[in-house]
Amino acid sequence: MEKKMAGFCIFFLVLFLAQEYGVEGKVCLNLSDKFKGPCLGTKNCDHHCRDIEHLLSGVCRDDFRCWCNRNC
């Protein structure tokens, strides 16, 4: 009886952990096509990429350009 209960608990533990560690798609970083001017604030770049270009997110990099993350 104890072996069945232990097996039952292990089964649900594995099932729970499998849900927590889902597979994520690959993300690519692309230069924004529509962002104008130097990228000085990541918040503005992120807003632009999400709301205007409908991508995942955006970030300013060392070259003062806005780079957007998208699914590959």
Curated annotation (Swiss-Prot):
Q: Which residues form the signal peptide?
A: 1-25
Q: Which SUPFAM superfamilies match?
A: Scorpion toxin-like (SSF57095)
Q: Which GO terms describe its biological process?
A: defense response to fungus; killing of cells of another organism
- PTM: Not glycosylated. Has 4 disulfide bonds.
Question: What intrachain disulfides are recorded?
Answer: C28-C72, C39-C60, C45-C66
Recorded hits in Pfam families, A to Z, give: Gamma-thionin
Q: Which residues cross the membrane?
A: none
- Look up keyword Disulfide bond and say if it applies: yes
PROSITE patterns per the UniProt record, alphabetical: GAMMA_THIONIN (PS00940)
Tell me which UniProt keywords the record has, alphabetically.
Allergen, Antimicrobial, Defensin, Disulfide bond, Fungicide, Signal
Q: What does this protein do?
A: Probably has antifungal activity.
Report the sequence similarity comment from the record: Belongs to the DEFL family.
Subunit structure of this chain's protein: May form dimers.
> Which protein are we looking at?
Defensin 3
